[in-house]
Amino acid sequence: MSLDTAEKQKLIENHQVHPTDTGSAEVQVAMLSKRISKLSDHLQGNIHDFASRQGLLKMIGKRKRLLSYLKDKNVQKYQELVKKIGIRG
């Protein structure tokens, strides 16, 4: 499940570090979280869609690695992001 351009732009605006930021860890985690949420909803109704399930697990792993990186680099930003997105809690 991909995000349309308007959704991506809204996520970037809400999580960017500076005005031209499109690829910081915060933005990437926010986009992955939104995609994970959409794909989880899809898998609730399509339990035999194993290809999508595998993609979901890959996205969860990537988000976990990005969050780990962010936690190592800046704990305060990590905590703010986790609270803002509503994960880990």
From Swiss-Prot:
Cross-referenced Gene3D superfamilies: 6.10.250.3130, S15/NS1, RNA-binding (1.10.287.10)
CDD domains: Ribosomal_S15p_S13e
Keywords annotated in UniProt: Ribonucleoprotein, Ribosomal protein, RNA-binding, rRNA-binding
UniProt-listed GO biological process terms: translation
Region (Disordered): 1-23
InterPro entries documented for this protein: Ribosomal_uS15, Ribosomal_uS15_bac-type, uS15_NS1_RNA-bd_sf
Compositional bias per record (Basic and acidic residues), positions renumbered to this chain: 1-18
GO MF entries: rRNA binding; structural constituent of ribosome
HAMAP family, per database record: Ribosomal_uS15_B
Entry function: One of the primary rRNA binding proteins, it binds directly to 16S rRNA where it helps nucleate assembly of the platform of the 30S subunit by binding and bridging several RNA helices of the 16S rRNA. Forms an intersubunit bridge (bridge B4) with the 23S rRNA of the 50S subunit in the ribosome.
Family: Belongs to the universal ribosomal protein uS15 family.
Entry protein name: Small ribosomal subunit protein uS15
Species this protein is from: Prochlorococcus marinus (strain MIT 9301)
